[in-house]
């Protein structure tokens, strides 16, 4: 059994650790003009060609909820194929905000995303890692935690992301819970959530309610994720259900 002096010593050391504040660099403001690889005419031709594909070929949505939503929005829906008037597309694009504030557990590390802000985030999804002896290893949850801690400590990194490496020592059925908890626990910066299914996305939102409070996340952005379409021109129910949860 530890003595009172030992317990006080541990408490003092913990207090000292908590006093150390990890500063984060602000987002990089892009003040240099963008490189323009195409002239105005080429941009207009590409824009017209892409809108022609959406109008004439369309996109498949393997999701009944999405199909109903597109009908209500005014798109031409036949079966699972949706075709879009270019006026509708431009109207929807115009409704997207130029920037949003992504709130972190530490309010001082919240980020403005968009505008001329450049944000630096760890890569995600690595199936292997390499140790100092150049051995290729299967990542574990402990490895992921270490990467999240490094992301927290590095001033130039603005987010802990989510599965920087894939923790292969945990089953896929609950891996997303471990990944999200590690992101939340080991860094107070912004983080990403798992969108590998609608159910997984719901679990992430429930965890965000615990961390930030249900009322807060109703009106503030606290987590982001990414979804991917299938080639060519197909969206499936798995990705779209996750998108709806995060929206």
Descriptions of predicted regions:
Residues 138-247:
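Helix-rich catalytic cores of soluble enzyme domains
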Residues 1-143:
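Acidic/polar, glycine-rich intrinsically disordered N-terminal extensions of enzymes
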């Amino acid at each position: 059994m530890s003595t009172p002096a030992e317990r006080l010593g541990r408490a003092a050391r913990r207090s000292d650790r908590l006093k150390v504040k990890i500063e984060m660099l602000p987002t990089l403001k892009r003040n240099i003009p963008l490189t323009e690889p195409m002239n105005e005419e080429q941009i207009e031709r590409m824009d017209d060609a892409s809108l022609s594909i959406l109008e004439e070929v369309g996109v498949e949505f393997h999701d009944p909820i999405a199909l109903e939503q597109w009908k209500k929005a005014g798109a031409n829906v036949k079966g699972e194929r949706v075709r879009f008037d270019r006026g509708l597309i431009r109207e929807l694009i115009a409704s997207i905000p130029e920037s949003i504030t992504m709130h972190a557990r530490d309010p001082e590390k919240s980020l403005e995303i968009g505008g001329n802000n450049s944000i630096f985030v760890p890569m995600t999804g690595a199936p292997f890692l390499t140790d100092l002896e150049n051995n290729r290893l299967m990542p574990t949850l402990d490895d992921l935690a270490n990467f999240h801690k490094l992301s927290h400590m590095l001033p130039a990194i603005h987010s802990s992301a989510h599965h920087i490496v894939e923790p292969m020592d945990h089953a896929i059925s609950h891996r997303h819970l471990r990944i999200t908890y590690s992101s939340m626990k080991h860094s107070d910066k912004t983080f990403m959530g798992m969108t590998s299914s609608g159910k997984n996305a719901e679990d992430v939102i429930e965890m965000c309610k615990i961390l930030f409070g249900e009322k807060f996340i109703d009106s503030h952005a606290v987590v982001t994720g990414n979804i991917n379409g299938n080639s060519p021109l197909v969206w499936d129910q798995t990705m779209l259900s996750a998108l709806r949860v995060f929206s």
